[in-house]
C-alpha cells in the first residue's frame, strides 16, 4: 500500500478492511467460484509477487509499504527487529486520522501492533473464524453507525493451522513419504482451500447485509502459497521461491473503481 492509497482512504474517509488468506494459492483462486465472483467486483491483481514466502515478512512489508531489507523484518525470525521508529505503518496513519483500528490474528508476530486500538490474538487450534469474524464485522458496523471510521485486519489462518499439524510437524523437507503422496497432498490442500471459499462467501454476505461496501475499501490478499510436493526439499513454504509460494493474489474492492484485471 503506497502513500496514494493512504491519502485516498483518509481524504474520502472510507473504512478499510484487509483480509489475509494465509497460505492461499493463486492457482486455486483462479479456478475458484467464490474468488472468481470477487474478481467481478474488484480490481484483481493475478500477478502479485509476495515479498517473502512466509507470513510475517510479507505482512510487515504490506503494512509498512517497504521491503524487509529496509524495515528490518527480512526473516521468519525478525518480527521483533522491525524498525518501528523509522517506518510509520498504515495502521498508525489511520489511527492518527481518527480511525478505530482492530486486528484479529493467530500470532503477534504477523504484523506490528503499533497504532492498533485493539490487537487480538486467538487460539488457532480452537477458533471458529467464520463466527468470530462475522461478529467483528457486526462490531464494525456499530462503529460505522456512530460515525466512527475503522480499519479492520482479519487473518484467516485455518489453511496454515492444518498444514502445520498435518505436514510441518510430522514431516521435514526431505521426508520421502510426503513427496511420494502428491495426490494426498493435493486433496489435503484442496479441502482446506474449499473451507476458505466458504469463509470468503460468508464475509462478503456479512459486508453486504450491513451495507458496508459503499463506505469501505476491502482488500483480500494471500501472504504466500503452499507447496503440495512440487519440489523435493520444500514440504510447505519458506524454503524455495517457486511460483507456487511467491505468486499470490489481491482483490481491491471499492465503489470508487470499476472492476478490472
Please describe what each predicted stretch is:
Residues 1-261:
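Catalytic domains that recognize anionic headgroups
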Amino acid at each position: 500500500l503506497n502513500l496514494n492509497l493512504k491519502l485516498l482512504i483518509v481524504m474520502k474517509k472510507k473504512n478499510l478492511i484487509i483480509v489475509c488468506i494465509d497460505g492461499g494459492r493463486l492457482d486455486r483462486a483462479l479456478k475458484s467460484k467464490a474468488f472468481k465472483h470477487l474478481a467481478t467486483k474488484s480490481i484483481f491483481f493475478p500477478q502479485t509477487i509476495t515479498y517473502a514466502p512466509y507470513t510475517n515478512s510479507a505482512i510487515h512489508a504490506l503494512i509498512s509499504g517497504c521491503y524487509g531489507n529496509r524495515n528490518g523484518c527480512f526473516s521468519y525470525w525478525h518480527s521483533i527487529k522491525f524498525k518501528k521508529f523509522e517506518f510509520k505503518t498504515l495502521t498508525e496513519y489511520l489511527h492518527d486520522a481518527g480511525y478505530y483500528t482492530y486486528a484479529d490474528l493467530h500470532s503477534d508476530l504477523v504484523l506490528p501492533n503499533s497504532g492498533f486500538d485493539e490487537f487480538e490474538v486467538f487460539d488457532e487450534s480452537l477458533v471458529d473464524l467464520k463466527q468470530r469474524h462475522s461478529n467483528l464485522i457486526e462490531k464494525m458496523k456499530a462503529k460505522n453507525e456512530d460515525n466512527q471510521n475503522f480499519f479492520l485486519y482479519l487473518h484467516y489462518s485455518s489453511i496454515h493451522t492444518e498444514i502445520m499439524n498435518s505436514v510441518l510437524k510430522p514431516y521435514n523437507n526431505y521426508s520421502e513419504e510426503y513427496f511420494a503422496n502428491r495426490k494426498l497432498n493435493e486433496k489435503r490442500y484442496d479441502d482446506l482451500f474449499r473451507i476458505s471459499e466458504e469463509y470468503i462467501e460468508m464475509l462478503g454476505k456479512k459486508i453486504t447485509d450491513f451495507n458496508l461496501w459503499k463506505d469501505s475499501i476491502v482488500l483480500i490478499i494471500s501472504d504466500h502459497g503452499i507447496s503440495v510436493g512440487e519440489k523435493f526439499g520444500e514440504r510447505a513454504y519458506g524454503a524455495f521461491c517457486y511460483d507456487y509460494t511467491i505468486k499470490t493474489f489481491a482483490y481491491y474492492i471499492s465503489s470508487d473503481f470499476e472492476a478490472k484485471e
